[in-house]
Amino acid sequence: MIDLEVYVEKERHNPLLRRREVYCRLSFEGKTPSRKEVRGKIAGLMNAEPERVVVDYIKTEFGKTEAKCYVKIYDTVEDLQKIEEEHIIERNKVEEQAEEAEEAEAGAAE
């Protein structure tokens, strides 16, 4: 697990789309954190289930251990499925499956 700190810069409630929009700054050591790690940290910080959290982007500057991040927290999973674009949903799912495969390979190698 990466040492990750999250600083919420702006939070906005969007009642029309039934979600909260969070702009935050990430501070970390080493490599840029994955969407799964950011989603888990923000879900814990904002008291939301990880299934309702979508990481839209993580932008880093070359050579810095900081990144800017935009996250959407939907009221329900159904709202997320109806409103969010398919490629964004897949982008947030694919990393989960890839990391699970890596963990399975690491367990098999031992």
Swiss-Prot record:
InterPro entries named in the record: eRP_eS24_sf (IPR053709), Ribosomal_eS24 (IPR001976), Ribosomal_eS24_CS (IPR018098), Ribosomal_uL23/eL15/eS24_sf (IPR012678)
Keywords linked to the UniProt accession: Ribonucleoprotein, Ribosomal protein
Region of interest (Disordered), ranges: 91-110
One cellular component term from this protein's GO annotations in UniProt: ribosome
Disulfide bonds: none
Keyword Transmembrane found: no
UniProt-recorded Gene Ontology molecular function terms: structural constituent of ribosome
Classification via Pfam families: Ribosomal_S24e (PF01282)
A biological process term (GO) from this entry: translation
PROSITE patterns, A to Z: RIBOSOMAL_S24E (PS00529)
Compositionally biased residues, Acidic residues: 97-110
HAMAP family: Ribosomal_eS24
Similarity comment: family membership: Belongs to the eukaryotic ribosomal protein eS24 family.
PANTHER family: 40S RIBOSOMAL PROTEIN S24
Protein name per the record: Small ribosomal subunit protein eS24
Native source organism of the sequence: Archaeoglobus fulgidus (strain ATCC 49558 / DSM 4304 / JCM 9628 / NBRC 100126 / VC-16)
Gene giving rise to this polypeptide: rps24e
